Amino acid sequence: MRGRTAFLDYLAHERRLSPNTVAAYRRDLDAFATELARHGIDDPRRVDEHHVRGLITRRHRQGLGPRSIQRLLSAIRSYYRYLMRE
């Protein structure tokens, strides 16, 4: 996924998020990238709400709790905001 490494560096160095938070965002974005790859999507501009909902549903069925799902959504939102600025 385009810009993922730069985004994580931005979180660590410019936003000064804790290493644990950056690691959690990395895992969340990895899960997001895996979900997109399942649909043959490698360009973040091609993502729509159905892809995100599919990921949320899948992660919920895998036992991810509500707070973790909220963090996943936050990671995705933050990633897209970062891409819009870049």
Give the positions of each predicted feature.
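A detector for short, charged/polar N-terminal pre-domain segments
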Residues: 1-2
